[in-house]
């Protein structure tokens, strides 16, 4: 009910699994519903934001990604598999993760679930380090 209220207030954004510059943009599918609890359009100078993420699909492609800011994530519902350099871990409801901007990771969902998280993004910064696959075969998720 709370998410429906945020939607009615214009605080929801559906993020697709690829952007308009992608050659197969016409095949884009919803990847995540993002609900803005604090700022819908956060200025870069503002130090943080608070959102709710409703994940609809696995992370794009076969590799890992990082963020342009440090962040905290708190799982409210569902859970997901997170792949880090140190291995693949199940993150269940109640899990709280603290990540730096140069942390590389990948999120994969359990089939038929839509995990819900509180996502607190920190101050913007530049990405550090290369995106790599850590030697993990992401196609087989091993």
Identify the residue ranges that each predicted region occupies:
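A glycine-rich, hydrophobic/aromatic-adjacent loop/helix-cap motif
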Residues: 18-25, 123-125, 135-142
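Acidic/His-leaning functional-site neighborhoods
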Residues: 102-104, 109-111, 127-142
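Short, solvent-exposed loop/turn segments at secondary-structure junctions
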Residues: 57-58, 80-81, 103-105, 122-126
């Amino acid at each position: 009910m709370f998410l429906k209220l945020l939607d009615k207030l214009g605080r929801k954004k559906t993020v697709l699994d690829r952007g308009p510059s992608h050659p197969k943009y016409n095949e884009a599918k919803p990847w995540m519903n993002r609900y803005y609890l604090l700022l819908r359009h956060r200025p870069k100078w503002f130090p943080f934001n608070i959102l709710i993420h409703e994940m609809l699909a696995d992370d794009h492609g076969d590799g890992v990604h990082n963020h342009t800011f440090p962040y905290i994530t708190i799982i409210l519902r569902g859970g997901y598999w997170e792949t880090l350099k140190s291995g693949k871990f199940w993150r269940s409801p109640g899990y709280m993760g603290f990540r730096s901007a140069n942390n590389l990771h990948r999120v994969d969902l359990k089939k038929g679930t839509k995990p819900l998280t509180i996502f607190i993004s920190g101050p913007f910064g530049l990405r550090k380090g290369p995106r790599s696959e850590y030697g993990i075969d992401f196609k087989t998720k091993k």
